[in-house]
Regions:
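The conserved Walker
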Residues: 31
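Conserved lysine of the Walker
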Residues: 35
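Phosphate-binding P-loop
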Residues: 16-22
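Short beta-strand-centered segment that lines the nucleotide-binding/catalytic pocket of NTP-utilizing
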Residues: 48-64
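Hydrophobic anchor at the beta1->P-loop junction of P-loop NTPases
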Residues: 25-27
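Short phosphate-coordinating micro-motif centered on Lys-Gly-acidic
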Residues: 80-141
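N-terminal pre-Walker A segment at the start of P-loop NTPase domains
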Residues: 1-14
Length: 141
């Protein structure tokens, strides 16, 4: 449980500090649960510019260079009927990148093998309950 946006961001920084490239972070949660704050932390852990990370709801996908390139997708505006496939997310993150996907429940499929699922929930006031699960398996399994 985090009690401030800065703590949620710090969780992201600690997670990504050990990334080596090819990781995918899928973020789930209602509006205002801290998904973008978590991605800012990922950027900080990757030595990218966290202040440049905003919710890319209108752009859908942005990239931030750092130790590894952070590709940040926000699927909020997508309907979830396969229109995510047109973004080319399956080609990302590549060996020198990390892909973070907000509103990951709108993905039509999860083709990646090294995935961190981050679930954020309101826990009253500024508190957030954050669950992180890592799974590494063959794509499409």
């Amino acid at each position: 449980v985090t009690s401030a946006e800065a703590e949620t961001s710090e969780l992201g920084a600690r997670l990504s500090a050990g990334f080596r490239g090819g990781e995918v972070v899928l973020l789930f949660g209602e509006l205002g649960t801290g998904k973008t704050a978590f991605v800012r932390g990922l950027a900080r852990g990757l030595l990218a510019e966290p202040e440049e990370v905003t919710s890319p709801s209108f752009v859908l996908l942005t990239s931030h260079p750092g130790r590894l390139t952070l590709h940040h997708a926000d699927l909020y505006r997508l309907r979830g009927d396969g229109d995510d496939l047109e973004l080319g997310l399956e080609e990302l993150p590549g060996p020198r990148g990390v892909l973070a996907v907000e509103w990951a429940e709108r993905l039509s499929r999860v083709p990646w093998s090294d995935v961190y699922e981050v679930r954020l929930e309101h826990a009253g006031g500024d508190r957030r309950r954050v669950g992180i699960e890592h799974r590494a398996e063959a794509p499409g399994a």
